[in-house]
């Protein structure tokens, strides 16, 4: 096994997560340290402005390049703060656009700068190969969930509530299925920021003070996304019309309705089998209103991933460390049942230019298995 640092900056724009993991891309060994470097408010605002303009941006846009550099340096700071002797880095980058129908998924981040600043080979560009093979480019975390869940009772579902919510379904026979299921925290975060100046509904306080508007919720659930068969994926801004539907509501009622939207989207997902357990990861598991709504539907079958010893705050970062090792070995990152790709697909590109030979020997070790 090798020591890999995974780096993740999600669409919620709350910070850069860094996590160490020992892995060979097949098995998951010991977990290393973890750290989160919060987005400075100014960088969050600039990144959000890039998200809003991404559909019309060129790759040489000066502000885009400036934001990309500052985001990369924030990732460098996360690696240094971890202070762990990594041999490889998995760098997801910051998604600013995800349109699989085009097909296009755009993650910004300078892998070359990251490699030079840390002295460690960097694996990046995890989604392009899947898109080229007819896949959605997301979600990519299911194969990591499957590796972590080895030996657990099945069938099992792992729900990640990040900016977008996605689910990994592991069948009794080990079959792996997955898809994005609907909004996660992104809409609720945007609503809270607009009405309270705080970038999230902390502890679900705003939603708990409000009432769900049934008519608005029905309108939200009428989005064509929910009629599409899985596998399917979402851009963070996919439900942009939600803000127009919510406009007449009070801040509290809007938050309550958005929380109910996330829960209803999960509950309405057609399942090929009934999981014996639901495990929840991602920032949404910290929202009591979301968790209460999910538990009403799952009962005792639902729990946070901490119940089985996983670190719910580090899971996505750990995943990209795991995927980095798989990518170097040429192992599949996605499958027909997880992204809709026509075949199992590997992916990722390795950035090692300018590094000493000693720093890149890990690549040969991994490729030899």
Task: List the predicted regions and their residue ranges.
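Phosphate/ATP-binding catalytic cores across multiple sugar-kinase/actin-like superfamilies
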Residues: 74-82, 251-274
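Phosphate-binding/catalytic loop of phosphoryl-transfer enzymes
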Residues: 3, 100-105, 112, 116, ...
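Glycine-rich phosphate-binding/hydrolytic loop that grips phosphoryl groups
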Residues: 13, 260, 306-356
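Conserved ATP-utilizing enzyme core subdomain
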Residues: 15-40, 44, 177-263, 339-365, ...
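Glycine-rich phosphate-binding loops at beta-strand->alpha-helix junctions
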Residues: 96, 275-297
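Gly/Thr-rich phosphate-binding beta-strand-loop-beta motif of the actin/hexokinase/Hsp70
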Residues: 1-33, 155-171
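Conserved non-catalytic scaffold segment of RNase H-like nuclease domains
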Residues: 30-70
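Short beta-strand-loop/turn "lid" adjacent to the catalytic site in phosphate-handling enzymes
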Residues: 54, 58-109
């Amino acid at each position: 096994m090798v020591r890999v640092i995974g780096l993740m900056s999600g669409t919620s724009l709350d910070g850069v997560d860094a996590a160490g993991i020992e892995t060979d891309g097949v098995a998951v060994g010991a977990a290393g340290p973890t750290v989160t470097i919060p987005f400075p408010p100014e960088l969050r605002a600039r990144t959000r402005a890039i998200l809003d303009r991404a559909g019309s941006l060129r790759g040489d846009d000066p502000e885009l390049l400036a934001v990309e550099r500052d985001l990369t340096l924030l990732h460098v700071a996360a690696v240094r703060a971890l202070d762990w002797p990594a041999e490889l880095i998995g760098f997801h980058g910051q998604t600013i656009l995800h349109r699989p129908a085009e097909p296009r998924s755009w993650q910004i981040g300078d892998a070359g700068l990251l490699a030079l600043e840390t002295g460690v080979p960097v694996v990046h560009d995890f989604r392009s190969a899947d898109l080229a093979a007819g896949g959605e480019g997301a979600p990519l975390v299911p194969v990591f969930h499957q590796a972590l869940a080895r030996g657990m009772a099945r069938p099992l579902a792992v729900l990640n509530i990040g900016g977008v919510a996605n689910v990994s379904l592991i069948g009794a026979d080990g079959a792996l299925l997955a898809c994005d299921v609907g909004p996660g925290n992104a809409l609720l975060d945007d609503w809270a920021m607009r009405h309270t100046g705080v970038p999230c509904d902390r502890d679900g306080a705003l939603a708990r003070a409000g009432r769900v508007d049934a008519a608005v919720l029905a309108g939200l659930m009428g989005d064509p996304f929910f009629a599409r068969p899985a596998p399917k994926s979402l851009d963070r801004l996919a439900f942009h019309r939600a803000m127009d539907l919510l406009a007449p509501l009070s801040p509290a009622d809007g938050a309550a309705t958005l929380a109910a939207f996330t829960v209803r989207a999960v509950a309405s997902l057609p399942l090929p089998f009934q999981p014996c357990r639901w495990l929840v990861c991602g920032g949404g598991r910290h929202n009591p209103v979301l968790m209460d709504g999910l538990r009403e539907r799952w009962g005792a079958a639902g729990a946070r991933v901490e119940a089985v010893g996983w670190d719910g705050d580090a899971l996505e970062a750990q995943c990209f460390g795991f995927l980095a090792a798989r990518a170097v070995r040429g192992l599949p990152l996605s499958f027909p049942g997880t992204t809709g790709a026509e075949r199992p697909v590997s992916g990722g590109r390795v950035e090692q230019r300018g590094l000493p030979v000693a720093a890149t020997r890990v690549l040969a070790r991994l490729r030899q298995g």
